């Protein structure tokens, strides 16, 4: 994901360059699931820069914790980031149980701060309803970025994403085999 962290690839002003950077990342992960079918999970992190602003960050982190928190705490940051948000205020801001309803509120609140939800946060939330979040820590060895651990169960990836990033790879392998069979490779 570090290849996508670069701000110039996240901007809608970058046009197709930004679209393909993230799309290529997902295609590569889809290929891994085909080449290594015993893989059951993707484990990684979402990165936010300190320049993002603590108010917007805290809104996003609260939303992720409310809807995707790993209650078993199988992984925890050694030194967790302590959000500065007012818990009572955020509970009132996000009163709904439905992710979609609270997501609309999150998007509006973050935009009101002059920011956007980071593209990878959106992308991960749209991969699977069973995504798990493990907490956030500051990486003092990489520009003091804030990294939130996540886990995606491959079997739970939405069919639409599976079709786009896994099945397209399977189809390309089938085509390659057809070309080889007819000596066209």
Per-range role (PLM):
Residues 1-131:
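Acyl-donor binding region in acyl/amide transferases
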Residues 85-185:
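Intrinsically disordered, low-complexity, positively biased terminal segments
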């Amino acid at each position: 994901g570090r290849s996508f962290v670069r701000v110039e690839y996240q901007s809608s002003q970058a046009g197709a360059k930004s679209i393909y950077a993230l799309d290529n990342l997902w295609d590569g992960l889809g290929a891994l699931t085909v080449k290594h079918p015993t893989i059951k999970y993707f484990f990684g992190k979402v990165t936010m820069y300190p320049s993002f602003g603590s108010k917007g960050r805290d809104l996003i982190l609260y939303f992720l914790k409310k809807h995707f928190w790993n209650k078993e705490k199988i992984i925890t940051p050694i030194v967790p980031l302590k959000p500065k948000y007012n818990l009572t205020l955020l509970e009132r801001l996000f009163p709904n149980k439905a992710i979609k309803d609270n997501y609309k509120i999150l998007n509006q609140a973050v935009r009101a701060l002059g920011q956007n939800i980071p593209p990878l946060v959106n992308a991960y939330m749209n991969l699977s309803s069973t995504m798990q979040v493990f907490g956030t820590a500051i990486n003092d060895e990489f520009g003091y970025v804030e990294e939130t651990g996540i886990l995606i169960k491959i079997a739970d990836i939405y069919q639409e994403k599976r079709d786009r990033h896994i099945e397209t790879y399977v189809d390309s392998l089938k085509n390659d085999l057809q070309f080889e069979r007819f000596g066209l490779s």
